[in-house]
Amino acid sequence: MPVKKITKEEILLKSSDVFRVKGYHNTSMQDLAEASGLLKGSLYYHFPSKEMLMKDLLISIHKYLTDSIFPIANDESILPEERMEKLLKKMGKLLLEKEGGCLIGNTTLETVGVVPEFQEVLQAIMNDWTAALKTIFETRKNSELSFRLAQQTIMEFEGAVMFSKLYNDRQFLYDAFARTMVKLN
C-alpha cells in the first residue's frame, strides 16, 4: 500500500480534534496517528514527541488567532460594539462548533505546572486575546479598567463555554456575550 502524503498542518488539524475530546494526557501518539491516517512511525517522522506536536499545535492556533480573529479589535471602520460582537462570535464559533471544550482552556488546566513547555505559548494566546479585548474596551473606558474588563470577559467566556458544553445549552454563552456588551457601554 502506498504511503499516504499528509502535511504537518493537516496532522495538526486532525490532532486538535483528538486533543479537544480526549485531553492532552489521555491522548496517545497512536490516537494521533490513527486520526491522521498514518502509521505511528510516520507520525514520529513529523513530530518526535507528543509534546512537540502539541506545542506546534498551540503555536499554530496562536498564529491563526493573531492573523484572523484578534485584528478585528483594531478595525476602526466598524463601531466598537460591532468589533466586540464580531470578535466574540468568531471565538464562540471556534469553541462550540466541535466536540470537546476549549483546547486552550483545557490544555492550560491540564498541563500548567506539569508540561512547562506549553506555558509560554498559552500565556501568549491569553495575553493577545486580552490585548484585543482591551483595545475595544479602551474606546469607552480608561486603560486600567479596560484591562480588567478584558480579563473578566475571557474568564466569563471560558466558563460560559464550559457550562454550554456541560448542559448542552448555548444560552450560557449568549448571556456572557450580552453581559460583555453591557460592560462595553
Tell where the protein language model's regions lie, with residue ranges.
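Helix-turn-helix
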Residues: 6, 10, 14-52, 56
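A general structural signal for well-ordered alpha-helical segments in protein cores
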Residues: 29, 54, 84, 101-105, ...
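Short, basic, alpha-helical segments at the C-terminal edge of helix-turn-helix-like DNA-binding modules
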Residues: 59-65
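Amphipathic alpha-helical packing segments from all-alpha helical-bundle domains
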Residues: 82, 86, 114-140
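C-terminal peripheral helix-coil segments that are non-catalytic and often amphipathic
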Residues: 94, 127, 131-139, 143, ...
